[in-house]
From Swiss-Prot:
Family statement: Belongs to the UPF0299 family.
Protein name in the entry: UPF0299 membrane protein YohJ
Gene Ontology CC terms: plasma membrane
Pfam families, sorted: LrgA (PF03788)
C-alpha cells in the first residue's frame, strides 16, 4: 500500500508542478503588453527552475515521461481541429508552404551559427596540424 501511495504521490507532484508552471506562465502572459503564449512562458519557467536546480528533475520526470509517451495521441485533437479550416488552408497553401520553408531555413542557420559560436572549430584526430 505504501509503495502504491508513493507512486501516486510522484505522479501527482509531477503534474502539479508542470501545471503550476503552465498557469504561472499564463498569468505572466496576461500581464505583458506583448502577445506571448502563456504555455511558452510556463515552459521557460519550468526550464529555469530545472536549470538552476531549484526544482529537482526527478520530481517532474514521471509526469514528463507520461506526456512524452502519449504525445502523438495528444496531437490528434489538434489535427482534427485544423481540418475545420481546410478551405482556408487550401486557399493559403502557397504562403503557408513558403513560410514553413523560410522558417525552417532560418532555424537551421541560427542553430548552425550558434553551434559554431559555442563549440568553435575543433581539430579532428589524425588531421594534419593536430599534433601537439
Amino acid at each position: 500500500m505504501s509503495k502504491t501511495l508513493n507512486i501516486i504521490w510522484q505522479y501527482l507532484r509531477a503534474f502539479v508542478l508542470i501545471y503550476a508552471c503552465l498557469y504561472a506562465g499564463i498569468f505572466i502572459a496576461s500581464l505583458l503588453p506583448v502577445t506571448i503564449p502563456g504555455s511558452i512562458i510556463g515552459m521557460l519557467i519550468l526550464f529555469v527552475l530545472l536549470a538552476l536546480q531549484i526544482l529537482p528533475a526527478k520530481w517532474v520526470n514521471p509526469g514528463c515521461y507520461v506526456l512524452i509517451r502519449y504525445m502523438a495521441l495528444l496531437f490528434v485533437p489538434i489535427g482534427v481541429g485544423v481540418m475545420q479550416y481546410f478551405d482556408l488552408l487550401r486557399a493559403q497553401f502557397g504562403p503557408v508552404v513558403v513560410s514553413c520553408a523560410v522558417s525552417t531555413l532560418v532555424v537551421f542557420l541560427v542553430v548552425s551559427w550558434s553551434s559554431q559560436l559555442v563549440h568553435g572549430e575543433r581539430k579532428v584526430v589524425g588531421q594534419k596540424g593536430s599534433e601537439e
